Amino acid sequence: MPARLDRLWQMWSPNKALGMTGVRAAYAIAPADAQEAVGALLRLGSSWPVGAHGVAMLSTWAEPAVQAWVRDSLATLREWKAAQLALCARMGWQTLPSVANYHLAQPMAADFAGLLAGLRAEGIKLRDCASFGLPGQVRMGVLPPASQAALHAAWQRLAGAN
């Protein structure tokens, strides 16, 4: 297997690991013997320009202090995710397994669009997954306890109104 790994390309986009979900920048690590393919890609040009914010993110990504912060934040992120999944269960929302710092949830609501609109009016923004082929589900980023409490409070107000 290790010999096969030498032929793989790696694509890295550290934006989500750094909590910078709106920043669009990535880099690729090519296999050692891929000079011809790398040249062909360079001749194609980038699919979109990387702004100064993306360059800054990629420039700092490999710094020891940044890597230490990412490593040290994993335990906190796991705790927040477990709490958020438990909250979804208490609200009666079904969730799908995920190893990422976001997950999918299906709120049990007769009026899904109305629920999303009501939550948005309360300041809670959930990504409707219909465009992913998953109608009735939302993508939820793992957020801190205060944000989870805000979701729960908004859900209770909306559920009480119906």
What does each model-found stretch correspond to?
Residues 1-5:
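Short, conserved loop/helix-junction motifs that constitute active-site signature segments
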Residues 7-89, 93-96:
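PLP-dependent aminotransferase class I/II
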Residues 16, 130-132:
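Short, acidic/turn-prone active-site loops that include or flank metal/cofactor-
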Residues 22, 99, 133-136:
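Short acidic/glycine-enriched loop/turn segments that link adjacent beta-strands
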Residues 30, 105-109, 142-144:
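Short beta-strand-to-loop capping motifs
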Residues 60, 83, 87-91, 114-124, ...:
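Generic non-transmembrane alpha-helical segments
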Residues 77-78, 88-122, 138:
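Conserved PLP-binding catalytic core of the aspartate aminotransferase-like
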Residues 118-122, 132-162:
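PLP-dependent enzyme catalytic core of the Aspartate aminotransferase-like
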